[in-house]
Amino acid sequence: MPGPTPSGTNVGSSGRSPSKAVAARAAGSTVRQRKNASCGTRSAGRTTSAGTGGMWRFYTEDSPGLKVGPVPVLVMSLLFIASVFMLHIWGKYTRS
C-alpha cells in the first residue's frame, strides 16, 4: 500500500470497500490536522496596508481608470433594470 497522501485520505488506493475503510478509520484512529509549513510564511510576505496595492487600490484616489461615484452607479443600474423590464413587456406584446 502506498504511503499516506497529503490530505490524509486514501481515495481509490485501498482494496477495501469505502464503508469498511471508514469503519476501520473511525474505530481506532484519531483525527490529525495537517500542519502546513507554508501557512505562516504566506501571510508574513503579504502586506495589508491600504496604499500598497492589491484590492484596496480600487477604492483609493491613485487607482487607474474612470472615477464613478456611487450615485451614478445606482442610477445606471436602475436604468438598466428598467430597460430590461420594458424590453420584456415590449417583446410580450409584439409576439402575440
Curated annotation (Swiss-Prot):
<feature type="compositionally biased region" description="Low complexity">
    <location>
        <begin position="40"/>
        <end position="50"/>
    </location>
</feature>
<feature type="modified residue" description="Phosphoserine">
    <location>
        <position position="14"/>
    </location>
</feature>
<dbReference type="GO" id="GO:0030970">
    <property type="term" value="P:retrograde protein transport, ER to cytosol"/>
</dbReference>
<dbReference type="InterPro" id="IPR016482">
    <property type="entry name" value="SecG/Sec61-beta/Sbh"/>
</dbReference>
<keyword id="KW-0449">Lipoprotein</keyword>
<dbReference type="GO" id="GO:0043022">
    <property type="term" value="F:ribosome binding"/>
</dbReference>
<keyword id="KW-0653">Protein transport</keyword>
<feature type="compositionally biased region" description="Polar residues">
    <location>
        <begin position="1"/>
        <end position="17"/>
    </location>
</feature>
<keyword id="KW-0256">Endoplasmic reticulum</keyword>
<keyword id="KW-0597">Phosphoprotein</keyword>
<dbReference type="GO" id="GO:0003723">
    <property type="term" value="F:RNA binding"/>
</dbReference>
<keyword id="KW-0812">Transmembrane</keyword>
<dbReference type="GO" id="GO:0031205">
    <property type="term" value="C:endoplasmic reticulum Sec complex"/>
</dbReference>
<keyword id="KW-0813">Transport</keyword>
<feature type="modified residue" description="Phosphoserine">
    <location>
        <position position="17"/>
    </location>
</feature>
<dbReference type="GO" id="GO:0005783">
    <property type="term" value="C:endoplasmic reticulum"/>
</dbReference>
<dbReference type="GO" id="GO:0016020">
    <property type="term" value="C:membrane"/>
</dbReference>
<dbReference type="GO" id="GO:0036503">
    <property type="term" value="P:ERAD pathway"/>
</dbReference>
<comment type="function">
    <text>Component of SEC61 channel-forming translocon complex that mediates transport of signal peptide-containing precursor polypeptides across the endoplasmic reticulum (ER). Forms a ribosome receptor and a gated pore in the ER membrane, both functions required for cotranslational translocation of nascent polypeptides.</text>
</comment>
<feature type="modified residue" description="Phosphoserine">
    <location>
        <position position="7"/>
    </location>
</feature>
<feature type="topological domain" description="Lumenal">
    <location>
        <begin position="92"/>
        <end position="96"/>
    </location>
</feature>
<protein>
    <recommendedName>
        <fullName>Protein transport protein Sec61 subunit beta</fullName>
    </recommendedName>
</protein>
<feature type="lipid moiety-binding region" description="S-palmitoyl cysteine">
    <location>
        <position position="39"/>
    </location>
</feature>
<dbReference type="Pfam" id="PF03911">
    <property type="entry name" value="Sec61_beta"/>
</dbReference>
<dbReference type="GO" id="GO:0006616">
    <property type="term" value="P:SRP-dependent cotranslational protein targeting to membrane, translocation"/>
</dbReference>
<comment type="similarity">
    <text>Belongs to the SEC61-beta family.</text>
</comment>
<dbReference type="GO" id="GO:0005829">
    <property type="term" value="C:cytosol"/>
</dbReference>
<dbReference type="GO" id="GO:0048408">
    <property type="term" value="F:epidermal growth factor binding"/>
</dbReference>
<feature type="modified residue" description="Phosphothreonine">
    <location>
        <position position="9"/>
    </location>
</feature>
<dbReference type="GO" id="GO:0031204">
    <property type="term" value="P:post-translational protein targeting to membrane, translocation"/>
</dbReference>
<dbReference type="GO" id="GO:0005789">
    <property type="term" value="C:endoplasmic reticulum membrane"/>
</dbReference>
<comment type="subunit">
    <text>The SEC61 channel-forming translocon complex consists of channel-forming core components SEC61A1, SEC61B and SEC61G and different auxiliary components such as SEC62 and SEC63. The SEC61 channel associates with the multi-pass translocon (MPT) complex. Interacts with TRAM1.</text>
</comment>
<feature type="transmembrane region" description="Helical">
    <location>
        <begin position="71"/>
        <end position="91"/>
    </location>
</feature>
<keyword id="KW-0007">Acetylation</keyword>
<dbReference type="GO" id="GO:0044322">
    <property type="term" value="C:endoplasmic reticulum quality control compartment"/>
</dbReference>
<keyword id="KW-1133">Transmembrane helix</keyword>
<dbReference type="GO" id="GO:0005784">
    <property type="term" value="C:Sec61 translocon complex"/>
</dbReference>
<dbReference type="GO" id="GO:0005085">
    <property type="term" value="F:guanyl-nucleotide exchange factor activity"/>
</dbReference>
<feature type="modified residue" description="Phosphoserine">
    <location>
        <position position="13"/>
    </location>
</feature>
<keyword id="KW-0564">Palmitate</keyword>
<feature type="modified residue" description="N-acetylproline">
    <location>
        <position position="2"/>
    </location>
</feature>
<feature type="region of interest" description="Disordered">
    <location>
        <begin position="1"/>
        <end position="54"/>
    </location>
</feature>
